[in-house]
Amino acid sequence: MVDGVPAPPGTVQAPDPSIGTGTGPSSDVASGLGPGRVVLVGAGPGDVELLTCKAARLIGEADWLVHDALVQPEVLALARRARIIAVGKRAGNPSARQSSINQILLDCAQRGGLTVRLKGGDPLIFARAQEELDVLHAAGVPVEVVPGISSAQAAHAALAMPMTERGRRRALVLATPQVHASDQRNTAALPLPVMPPPMDLQQAAAPVPPSRRKVLSAAEIVADPELRRWAEAIVAAGSGTLYMAATVSDQVRDTLLALGMPPETPTLWMVDVSLPEQAMVPGVLGTLQPPPAALKGKPALLLVGVVPPDVRRTEAP
């Protein structure tokens, strides 16, 4: 991190010298006197004050810290002794491959000490945690998961609106409409990595072009029983929260309408949830559009069917 700005993907660095040496594990640990362990930690929605006490403690104790792009500089500043490795993934931008991230975690564990895998929000919600857990378990690495406040929770808290309500909202739907080229591939038979020899961490974290996504029409989604499940769940519940929907808002709109959701259903884009620059863009499903251009590239949630009547549009900066 330089002048409070997090490193780009592919960077291996120490924190600012004023807050720690960032040298990684001590020589005793690195020499193999104790096995390394990995903890998947939720960094919360953004506001550093929404970090859990346990998460803050582990970040401060970490020897290696492998973090996503959405983790705020104020959170990274808590890593007073860790070697920091940025492996952020952002839609449409070069990022580290998931397979490379898996190998980095294995290598850090082999080198000893505590590795914190820091993920935005909660590490078990749309964060590809299962792939990392599978690899770590297969290699015999001790692993733990520390939950975090999800962006969906923070969004509803910002609205002072419960996610469930007795007699009205009996189901809670968190979904993503994104479809990747590898989603239909059977990965069950693929061999899981074993503990690798030490590698060049900076080379392993090097960014590559963004992964290929399938751009499907609403008709294709509706015709596929598996791909339409997220939409069926929202229609059945009458409401839901969508992650990673900003680049496929047309498909979201058309799919929900095709499955019978009323066009007057309220919608609300929430951007930079929990941060001072948080923005809200209300609308209705029938005319749903992506967030304004001024908010493009920022983390956004789409709330469907749960917007309180007194929400007023927050103009984009």
Per-region residue spans from a language model:
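Conserved beta-alpha
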Residues: 145-152, 171-181, 306-317
